Amino acid sequence: MKKMLVEFRDFALKGNVLDLAVAVVIGAAFGKIVSSLVDNIIMPLVGVLLGGLDFTDLSFKVGKSVIQYGAFIQSIVDFVIIAFAIFIFVKVLTSFIKKKEQTVEETPVPPTEEYLKEIRDLLKEQQK
């Protein structure tokens, strides 16, 4: 049992797991911000542009059930904004990684084969 707890601790404290946990918390908070932006600012403005339409009231009845397609439309707008923000974030992060890789690639690696050939030639000359 003690060994399993130690293994779990080692797993949970790895950098990747902690990074993932932080990303999930930040992502949840970001999702709430975007939902508020869509619900309280974007959709009311879109409603005004469409002649005073209130998306929260868009629904129809099927028997006793109420289909609230206005809320669904707001969820789609939420998704599009979050997906676009993640796309931009990944694009920026990827460009930073590529720049870093290019910097590493640009540093010349000493030509070890050339050095070895020079050493060999010098040793041959010394033996003569």
Curated annotation (Swiss-Prot):
GO terms for molecular function: mechanosensitive monoatomic ion channel activity. Gene3D superfamilies: Large-conductance mechanosensitive channel, MscL, domain 1. The chain crosses the membrane at residues 11-31, 70-90. One of its GO terms (cellular component) is plasma membrane. Keywords: Cell membrane, Ion channel, Ion transport, Membrane, Transmembrane, Transmembrane helix, Transport. PROSITE patterns: MSCL. It is found in: Cell membrane. It is a multi-pass membrane protein. Homopentamer. HAMAP family: MscL. Channel that opens in response to stretch forces in the membrane lipid bilayer. May participate in the regulation of osmotic pressure changes within the cell. Belongs to the MscL family. This is Large-conductance mechanosensitive channel. It comes from Listeria monocytogenes serotype 4b (strain CLIP80459). The lineage of its organism: Bacteria, Bacillati, Bacillota, Bacilli, Bacillales.
